C-alpha cells in the first residue's frame, strides 16, 4: 500500500482501499454470522459473497504480476470457497424472501419459518423444511414452541399445512 500522498495519482488506489477494507472487515462479518439470525444473517451472507468475489477477482488479477504466487493462490482459494458457501446461503435467503412475498404483503417482513396463530406470527426454529406439530387438549406446540390457536405453518417461505409436509397429531401424548 502507498501513502496518502500519491492516492489521487495512483490508478488502482480505489482497488487497494476496497481490498484493505475487505481484508479488515471480513473476519468481523464472519464472526457476526455466529451471533446473527434471520434477515440480518441473509444480508451478511450477501455482503460476504460480494466481498469474497471482489477479493478473489483482485487476487487472481494480481497473481499474474506478483512474485509471491503461493500466498495469492491460497488466498484466492479461500476467497473462492467462502464465496461459494456465501452464495448458496444467499440464494436460500433470497428464494425464501421471494416465496414470502408471493404469499402476500403481510408476510414480506415475516421470518422464513413461522407459525400463524390467533395471536399473530411467531418465529419457530426449524431444521430444513421439517416441523413437528402436536395438538393436545388445551395446547398446540410446534417444535416445542407453544402456539395459541394454530392457523397455518410456513417453513422456508412455503405454507406447510396445505402441502401435507407437517406431522399434525391430534390429541397426541
From Swiss-Prot:
Keywords: Disulfide bond, Host membrane, Membrane, Transmembrane, Transmembrane helix, Viral envelope protein, Virion. Residues 1-11, 61-69 are virion surface. Residues 33-39, 91-173 are intravirion. It is a multi-pass membrane protein. The chain crosses the membrane at residues 12-32, 40-60, 70-90. It comes from the Viruses. GO terms for cellular component: host cell membrane; membrane; viral envelope; virion membrane. It is found in: Virion membrane; Host membrane. Major envelope protein. Belongs to the arteriviridae membrane protein family. Heterodimer with the membrane protein; disulfide-linked. This heterodimerization is required for transport to the Golgi complex. This is Membrane protein. It comes from Porcine reproductive and respiratory syndrome virus (strain Lelystad) (PRRSV). The gene is M.
